[in-house]
Protein backbone atom coordinates (compact mmCIF):
# COMPACT_ATOMS: atom_id res chain seq x y z
CA UNK A 1 0.00 0.00 0.00
CA UNK A 2 3.02 2.28 0.34
CA UNK A 3 3.92 1.80 -3.34
CA UNK A 4 0.57 1.88 -5.12
CA UNK A 5 -2.50 4.11 -5.08
CA UNK A 6 -5.99 2.81 -5.83
CA UNK A 7 -7.91 4.66 -8.56
CA UNK A 8 -11.39 3.95 -9.88
CA UNK A 9 -13.43 4.32 -13.04
CA UNK A 10 -16.88 5.80 -13.62
CA UNK A 11 -20.19 3.99 -13.47
CA UNK A 12 -21.78 4.76 -16.84
CA UNK A 13 -24.28 1.91 -16.69
CA UNK A 14 -27.28 4.26 -16.47
CA UNK A 15 -26.41 6.07 -19.69
CA UNK A 16 -29.61 7.15 -21.41
CA UNK A 17 -31.60 7.23 -18.19
CA UNK A 18 -32.49 10.18 -15.98
CA UNK A 19 -30.51 8.50 -13.18
CA UNK A 20 -27.23 8.66 -15.15
CA UNK A 21 -25.61 11.48 -13.18
CA UNK A 22 -26.91 10.32 -9.79
CA UNK A 23 -25.62 6.80 -10.32
CA UNK A 24 -22.20 7.99 -11.50
CA UNK A 25 -21.77 10.43 -8.60
CA UNK A 26 -22.92 7.96 -5.94
CA UNK A 27 -20.53 5.29 -7.19
CA UNK A 28 -17.72 7.84 -7.28
CA UNK A 29 -18.35 8.71 -3.64
CA UNK A 30 -18.51 5.04 -2.70
CA UNK A 31 -15.17 4.37 -4.39
CA UNK A 32 -13.60 7.33 -2.63
CA UNK A 33 -14.88 6.04 0.70
CA UNK A 34 -13.29 2.67 -0.10
CA UNK A 35 -9.92 4.35 -0.65
CA UNK A 36 -9.79 5.43 -4.30
CA UNK A 37 -7.47 8.41 -4.76
CA UNK A 38 -8.24 9.34 -8.37
CA UNK A 39 -10.38 8.54 -11.40
CA UNK A 40 -9.37 7.17 -14.77
CA UNK A 41 -8.61 6.44 -17.43
CA UNK A 42 -11.65 8.38 -18.64
CA UNK A 43 -11.59 8.23 -22.43
CA UNK A 44 -13.18 9.87 -25.46
CA UNK A 45 -11.75 8.82 -28.80
CA UNK A 46 -14.57 10.35 -30.77
CA UNK A 47 -17.86 8.58 -30.14
CA UNK A 48 -18.38 9.31 -26.47
CA UNK A 49 -17.05 8.93 -22.96
CA UNK A 50 -16.05 5.54 -21.60
CA UNK A 51 -13.59 4.13 -19.09
CA UNK A 52 -10.76 1.80 -20.04
CA UNK A 53 -11.53 -1.91 -19.54
CA UNK A 54 -15.25 -1.26 -19.10
CA UNK A 55 -17.98 -2.14 -21.59
CA UNK A 56 -20.32 0.83 -21.13
CA UNK A 57 -19.95 3.89 -23.35
CA UNK A 58 -21.93 7.09 -22.94
CA UNK A 59 -22.27 7.44 -26.70
CA UNK A 60 -22.68 11.03 -27.83
CA UNK A 61 -21.65 12.43 -24.44
CA UNK A 62 -18.31 14.16 -24.76
CA UNK A 63 -16.00 15.64 -22.16
CA UNK A 64 -17.64 19.08 -22.23
CA UNK A 65 -21.20 17.74 -21.97
CA UNK A 66 -23.23 19.31 -19.11
CA UNK A 67 -23.94 15.79 -17.84
CA UNK A 68 -20.24 15.45 -17.02
CA UNK A 69 -20.17 18.60 -14.89
CA UNK A 70 -21.52 17.02 -11.66
CA UNK A 71 -18.90 14.29 -12.01
CA UNK A 72 -16.09 16.83 -12.37
CA UNK A 73 -17.39 18.87 -9.45
CA UNK A 74 -17.62 15.77 -7.27
CA UNK A 75 -14.01 14.95 -8.11
CA UNK A 76 -13.05 18.46 -7.04
CA UNK A 77 -14.93 18.12 -3.76
CA UNK A 78 -13.31 14.77 -3.02
CA UNK A 79 -9.84 15.84 -4.13
CA UNK A 80 -9.68 13.15 -6.82
CA UNK A 81 -7.68 13.95 -9.98
CA UNK A 82 -9.05 12.71 -13.31
CA UNK A 83 -6.80 10.95 -15.78
CA UNK A 84 -8.18 11.76 -19.24
CA UNK A 85 -7.43 10.12 -22.60
CA UNK A 86 -8.76 12.36 -25.34
CA UNK A 87 -8.51 11.69 -29.09
CA UNK A 88 -5.63 9.72 -30.62
CA UNK A 89 -2.34 10.75 -32.28
CA UNK A 90 -2.93 13.00 -35.25
CA UNK A 91 -1.46 10.53 -37.75
CA UNK A 92 -4.41 8.22 -37.12
CA UNK A 93 -6.73 10.79 -38.69
CA UNK A 94 -4.64 11.25 -41.84
CA UNK A 95 -4.79 9.31 -45.14
CA UNK A 96 -2.83 6.05 -45.30
CA UNK A 97 -0.30 7.29 -47.81
CA UNK A 98 3.39 8.11 -48.18
CA UNK A 99 2.86 11.57 -46.70
CA UNK A 100 1.69 10.14 -43.36
CA UNK A 101 4.87 10.19 -41.29
CA UNK A 102 3.35 8.02 -38.58
CA UNK A 103 1.84 5.49 -40.95
CA UNK A 104 3.29 2.50 -39.04
CA UNK A 105 1.00 3.17 -36.09
CA UNK A 106 -1.45 5.42 -37.89
CA UNK A 107 -2.76 2.64 -40.11
CA UNK A 108 -3.05 0.08 -37.31
CA UNK A 109 -5.04 2.42 -35.06
CA UNK A 110 -6.83 4.31 -37.82
CA UNK A 111 -9.75 6.53 -36.76
CA UNK A 112 -12.68 6.00 -39.10
CA UNK A 113 -14.15 9.45 -39.63
CA UNK A 114 -16.96 7.99 -41.75
CA UNK A 115 -18.67 6.63 -38.62
CA UNK A 116 -21.69 8.84 -37.83
CA UNK A 117 -21.03 11.09 -34.87
CA UNK A 118 -17.27 10.55 -34.87
CA UNK A 119 -15.54 13.70 -33.62
CA UNK A 120 -12.42 15.06 -35.27
CA UNK A 121 -9.14 15.52 -33.42
CA UNK A 122 -9.70 19.27 -33.32
CA UNK A 123 -13.22 18.89 -31.93
CA UNK A 124 -12.09 16.53 -29.18
CA UNK A 125 -9.25 18.79 -28.04
CA UNK A 126 -11.62 21.79 -28.01
CA UNK A 127 -14.18 19.84 -25.96
CA UNK A 128 -11.53 18.79 -23.47
CA UNK A 129 -10.22 22.35 -23.20
CA UNK A 130 -13.73 23.60 -22.47
CA UNK A 131 -14.16 21.03 -19.70
CA UNK A 132 -10.87 22.05 -18.07
CA UNK A 133 -11.79 25.74 -18.36
CA UNK A 134 -15.28 25.29 -16.91
CA UNK A 135 -14.07 23.33 -13.88
CA UNK A 136 -11.07 25.20 -12.46
CA UNK A 137 -11.25 23.39 -9.12
CA UNK A 138 -11.00 19.97 -10.74
CA UNK A 139 -7.54 18.59 -11.42
CA UNK A 140 -7.16 17.03 -14.88
CA UNK A 141 -4.20 14.87 -15.91
CA UNK A 142 -4.25 14.43 -19.69
CA UNK A 143 -2.34 11.32 -20.66
CA UNK A 144 -0.16 10.99 -23.77
CA UNK A 145 0.57 14.74 -23.97
CA UNK A 146 -3.14 15.24 -24.78
CA UNK A 147 -2.39 13.29 -27.98
CA UNK A 148 -0.88 16.48 -29.39
CA UNK A 149 2.73 15.34 -29.65
CA UNK A 150 2.57 16.30 -33.33
CA UNK A 151 2.40 19.95 -32.19
CA UNK A 152 3.43 20.41 -28.57
CA UNK A 153 2.72 24.13 -28.77
CA UNK A 154 -0.94 23.11 -28.32
CA UNK A 155 -0.01 21.39 -25.06
CA UNK A 156 2.04 24.38 -23.95
CA UNK A 157 -0.79 26.80 -24.68
CA UNK A 158 -3.26 24.76 -22.62
CA UNK A 159 -0.81 24.41 -19.74
CA UNK A 160 -0.27 28.17 -19.82
CA UNK A 161 -4.01 28.84 -19.78
CA UNK A 162 -5.19 26.33 -17.17
CA UNK A 163 -3.42 25.86 -13.85
CA UNK A 164 -5.61 22.82 -13.08
CA UNK A 165 -4.18 20.87 -16.03
CA UNK A 166 -1.29 18.42 -15.94
CA UNK A 167 -0.08 16.03 -18.63
CA UNK A 168 1.73 12.72 -18.65
CA UNK A 169 4.21 11.44 -21.22
CA UNK A 170 2.98 7.85 -21.35
CA UNK A 171 3.42 6.00 -24.64
CA UNK A 172 4.69 9.12 -26.40
CA UNK A 173 8.43 8.55 -26.14
CA UNK A 174 8.70 7.35 -29.72
CA UNK A 175 6.82 10.39 -30.98
CA UNK A 176 9.08 12.89 -29.18
CA UNK A 177 12.56 11.35 -29.01
CA UNK A 178 13.36 12.55 -32.52
CA UNK A 179 13.38 16.20 -31.38
CA UNK A 180 15.61 16.14 -28.27
CA UNK A 181 16.58 19.82 -28.15
CA UNK A 182 12.97 20.97 -28.35
CA UNK A 183 11.90 18.39 -25.78
CA UNK A 184 14.57 19.43 -23.31
CA UNK A 185 13.29 23.00 -23.49
CA UNK A 186 9.68 21.82 -23.21
CA UNK A 187 10.30 19.61 -20.19
CA UNK A 188 12.31 22.32 -18.49
CA UNK A 189 9.66 24.98 -19.04
CA UNK A 190 6.78 22.78 -17.88
CA UNK A 191 8.68 20.71 -15.33
CA UNK A 192 6.03 21.37 -12.66
CA UNK A 193 3.18 20.09 -14.86
CA UNK A 194 4.44 16.86 -16.43
CA UNK A 195 4.15 13.37 -14.92
CA UNK A 196 6.14 10.27 -15.79
CA UNK A 197 4.12 7.47 -17.35
CA UNK A 198 4.68 4.48 -19.64
CA UNK A 199 1.54 2.58 -20.81
CA UNK A 200 3.83 0.06 -22.50
CA UNK A 201 3.79 -2.99 -20.26
CA UNK A 202 6.06 -3.82 -17.34
CA UNK A 203 9.33 -5.08 -18.84
CA UNK A 204 12.68 -3.88 -17.55
CA UNK A 205 13.75 -3.11 -21.12
CA UNK A 206 10.80 -0.75 -21.59
CA UNK A 207 11.65 1.19 -18.42
CA UNK A 208 15.33 1.33 -19.36
CA UNK A 209 14.38 2.81 -22.73
CA UNK A 210 12.31 5.57 -21.12
CA UNK A 211 15.13 6.36 -18.69
CA UNK A 212 17.62 6.46 -21.57
CA UNK A 213 15.46 8.94 -23.45
CA UNK A 214 14.81 11.19 -20.46
CA UNK A 215 18.16 11.04 -18.67
CA UNK A 216 20.97 10.58 -21.20
CA UNK A 217 22.42 12.49 -24.11
CA UNK A 218 22.74 9.33 -26.23
CA UNK A 219 22.16 9.94 -29.91
CA UNK A 220 20.82 8.02 -32.88
CA UNK A 221 19.56 4.79 -31.35
CA UNK A 222 16.61 2.66 -32.40
CA UNK A 223 13.81 1.01 -30.44
CA UNK A 224 12.09 -1.47 -32.79
CA UNK A 225 9.12 -2.09 -30.50
CA UNK A 226 8.05 1.56 -30.87
CA UNK A 227 7.18 0.99 -34.55
CA UNK A 228 8.56 4.22 -35.98
CA UNK A 229 11.12 4.56 -38.74
CA UNK A 230 13.15 7.37 -37.20
CA UNK A 231 15.97 7.17 -34.66
CA UNK A 232 15.79 8.47 -31.10
CA UNK A 233 18.01 10.72 -29.02
CA UNK A 234 18.11 11.40 -25.30
CA UNK A 235 16.86 14.63 -23.75
CA UNK A 236 19.58 14.86 -21.07
CA UNK A 237 17.15 16.42 -18.58
CA UNK A 238 18.58 18.10 -15.46
CA UNK A 239 18.22 16.28 -12.15
CA UNK A 240 15.82 18.91 -10.82
CA UNK A 241 13.47 18.32 -13.76
CA UNK A 242 13.72 14.55 -13.39
CA UNK A 243 12.85 14.72 -9.69
CA UNK A 244 9.70 16.65 -10.51
CA UNK A 245 8.42 14.47 -13.33
CA UNK A 246 9.31 11.18 -11.63
CA UNK A 247 8.08 11.96 -8.11
CA UNK A 248 7.46 15.45 -6.80
CA UNK A 249 4.61 16.45 -9.12
CA UNK A 250 2.69 13.28 -8.35
CA UNK A 251 3.09 13.76 -4.61
CA UNK A 252 1.84 17.33 -4.94
CA UNK A 253 -1.31 16.55 -6.90
CA UNK A 254 -2.21 13.62 -4.64
CA UNK A 255 -2.16 15.66 -1.44
PLM regions: where:
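Generic structural signal for well-ordered alpha-helices
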Residues: 24-28, 68, 72, 128-132, ...
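Short helix-to-loop capping/linker segments positioned immediately adjacent to catalytic or ligand/cofactor-binding
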Residues: 59-63, 115, 142
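Active-site gating/metal-coordination segments in enzymes
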Residues: 1-110
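Short charge-dense sequence patches
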Residues: 81, 102-108, 133-137, 196-200
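A short, flexible N-terminal coil/short beta segment enriched in small residues
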Residues: 87-99, 130-134, 138-144
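H/E-rich (His + Asp/Glu) clusters that bind or coordinate divalent metals
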Residues: 116, 122-130, 137-255
